[in-house]
């Protein structure tokens, strides 16, 4: 079964990224207020995930977003999304976005094509 180029997880629910919707009334969307990390994924394993999540926690604390107690949810979201994306068959990027409105958005993206050298 072919996979869409991008899958997303919004608050733990996995779906094609194009079908994932955030309400326009969401405070993080309205104010442009949140934090994000982009993580390289090799064979279904996010590189330095612990370091990235630590940085996200630090950023949410600095902005007073109140996310420090939800690390376990993020770890579960990451595992569920990467499993849906093909597990060890997936090489690409994982973007994690946390908003002031309390949303957890994770998106998988394929690696951009590299140009051919003549």
What label would you give each PLM region?
Residues 1-118:
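Conserved alpha/beta cores of soluble small-molecule-handling proteins
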